[in-house]
């Protein structure tokens, strides 16, 4: 009986281990198959920064890493209060303006609307406010925006997107300020806020490869001998540009669907010359701001000090008037 019980337990354990391994293998397979099947569509999403730079999205130079894939510079604005009190909810507004009539190149080469995304780097201790602390008025401004922390231990770094650009050129973040009275690691004072905002797909993947939302150049000097259009089983179109150097073998440059060819067969090109136009209409921008975590006691003290100064000035004016009246009475006497 004892041996049978031990055997049963071992059998159940083995089954559990096998089941866990199968789930893990299926998950990994699904992840990589999606990455291979749809690499261009995923490259525009902010979570690529999380995977490539897990510690922080800001380099030591101050540049936010989204600029490594979104090469064009575009304006981004941020609005935060000059100062806030502890344990209060305020809003940070990130503005990502662009021409809504513009269309970008999609993963399949078709023209589609632009998406937007943003990263908000708050000071330590600041975080997205819980739902029960958000007023109805502020909730209306937020809409259905989903805020994702950069990592489990970095609630002060928040990413958003991709979102439809036509609806979200302004993204409202509900932020809860920390309370130094309950967290001894937090101190009153001035802090920096860093913001990055992008519109449209990136031009480079985190691996360094170009996306189809980029300019393609000739890799050799010579004459374009042939331009062949190819289509794979999934219907994805690409062009093979054959360049014949003065000596040596033909060099083949592959151009995906999306950018428009601006060269033709028989045309002479030099290495580095553009084979296509630049289809990118988006870009990335970042801004820095400052916010003060204000001590309520100091604010009250400042108000009291200002009131005393004003009262002293009033008393001085009244005293001066009194002296003037006394002097006038003595002169009349």
From Swiss-Prot:
Tell me which domain of life the UniProt entry assigns to the organism this sequence originates from: Bacteria
Origin organism is: Desmonostoc sp. (strain PCC 7906) (Nostoc sp. (strain PCC 7906))
Q: What does this protein do?
A: Component of the cytochrome b6-f complex, which mediates electron transfer between photosystem II (PSII) and photosystem I (PSI), cyclic electron flow around PSI, and state transitions.
One of the record's GO molecular function terms: heme binding
Could you tell me which PROSITE patterns the record lists for this protein?
A: CYTF (PS51010)
Q: Where are the transmembrane segments?
A: 301-318
- Signal sequence residues: 1-44
The family classification in the record reads:
Belongs to the cytochrome f family.
Cofactor section: heme
Write down the Gene3D superfamilies for this protein, in alphabetical order: 2.40.50.100, Cytochrome f large domain, Single helix bin
What keywords are annotated for this sequence in UniProt? Electron transport, Heme, Iron, Membrane, Metal-binding, Photosynthesis, Signal, Thylakoid, Transmembrane, Transmembrane helix, Transport
Protein name in the entry? Cytochrome f
Q: How is the cofactor bound?
A: Binds 1 heme group covalently.
Give the main localization category: membrane
Where in or outside the cell is it found? Answer: Cellular thylakoid membrane
Q: Name one GO biological process term.
A: photosynthesis
Q: Does the keyword Lyase apply?
A: no
> InterPro entries recorded for this chain?
Cyt-f_TM (IPR024058), Cyt_f (IPR002325), Cyt_f_lg_dom (IPR024094), Cyt_f_lg_dom_sf (IPR036826), Rudment_hybrid_motif (IPR011054)
């Amino acid at each position: 009986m004892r041996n049978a019980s031990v055997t049963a337990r071992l059998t159940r354990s083995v089954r559990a281990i096998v089941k866990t391994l199968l789930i893990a293998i299926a998950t990994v397979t699904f992840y990589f198959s999606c990455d291979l099947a749809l690499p261009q569509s995923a490259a525009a999403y902010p979570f690529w920064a999380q995977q490539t730079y897990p510690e922080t999205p800001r380099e030591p130079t101050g540049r936010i890493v989204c600029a490594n894939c979104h090469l064009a510079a575009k304006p981004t604005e941020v609005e935060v209060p000059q100062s806030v009190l502890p344990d209060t909810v305020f809003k940070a507004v990130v503005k990502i303006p662009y021409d809504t009539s513009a269309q970008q190149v999609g993963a399949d080469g078709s023209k589609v609307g632009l998406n937007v995304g943003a990263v908000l780097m708050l000071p330590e201790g600041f975080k997205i406010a819980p739902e029960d602390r958000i007023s109805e008025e502020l909730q209306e401004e937020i809409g259905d925006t989903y805020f994702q922390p950069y990592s489990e231990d970095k609630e002060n770094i928040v990413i958003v997107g991709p979102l439809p650009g036509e609806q979200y050129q302004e993204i409202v973040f509900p932020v809860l300020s920390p309370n130094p009275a309950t967290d001894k690691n937090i101190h009153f004072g001035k802090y920096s806020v860093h913001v990055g905002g992008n519109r449209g797909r990136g031009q480079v993947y985190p691996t360094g490869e170009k996306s189809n939302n980029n300019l393609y150049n000739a890799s050799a000097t010579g004459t374009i001998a042939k331009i062949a259009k190819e289509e794979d089983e999934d219907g994805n179109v690409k062009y093979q540009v054959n360049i014949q150097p003065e000596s040596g073998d033909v060099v083949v440059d592959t151009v995906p669907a999306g950018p428009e060819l601006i060269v033709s067969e028989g045309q002479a090109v030099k290495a580095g010359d553009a084979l296509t136009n630049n289809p990118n209409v988006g870009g990335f921008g970042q801004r820095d701001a400052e916010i003060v975590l204000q001590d309520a006691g100091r604010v009250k003290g400042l108000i009291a000090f200002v009131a005393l100064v004003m009262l002293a000035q009033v008393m001085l004016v009244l005293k001066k008037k009194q002296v003037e009246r006394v002097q006038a009475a003595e002169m009349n006497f």
